[in-house]
Regions:
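Multi-pass alpha-helical transmembrane bundles in non-GPCR membrane proteins
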Residues: 1-139
Length: 139
């Protein structure tokens, strides 16, 4: 995949919007954790919401850092983290659903949870691999 070059204004807008996402995520996290602690299974709910928040914030933090950095070697590495963190964000989003809603559904919850997280880990790792042009594997 070709590296898209953003102009200065686009980079500034990306940095600002993702930085705002971090702040809003922290605020929302407080309310989500508060609500989770009132759940019938508070330990499960708080753990699942924490995983969700970690995935979401990893995505916003890595993206903010990537878009806010100057061109160079560091930016190239941060781009890989930015792309890899999307997989963690997706898996974190599935976690509350699979372990709070589906956990007692005859193995479906744990099965989907394992599949999603193994896929996310594979995607994260592939984000750091240099693939041949026109490879069937891309992140």
């Amino acid at each position: 995949m070709k590296n898209k070059r953003y102009n200065h204004i686009e980079e500034w807008a990306n940095t600002l919007s993702h930085g705002i996402g971090i702040l809003l995520g922290i605020v929302a996290g407080y309310f989500l954790l508060e609500k989770a602690s009132e759940n019938m299974e508070p330990q499960w709910a708080v753990a699942c919401v924490s995983v969700y928040l970690a995935g979401m914030l990893s995505s916003y933090v890595s993206s903010t850092w990537y878009h806010g950095s100057r061109p160079g070697k560091l930016k190239e590495v941060l781009r890989k983290f930015d792309h890899g963190a999307i997989y963690l964000h997706i898996a974190g989003t599935y976690t509350p659903f699979t372990l709070l809603v589906l956990r007692h559904a005859g193995g479906w919850g744990w099965g989907i949870f394992a599949f999603v997280w193994l896929s996310a880990i594979a995607g994260f790792i592939l984000s750091f691999k240099k693939l041949k042009e026109h490879s069937n594997l891309e992140t």
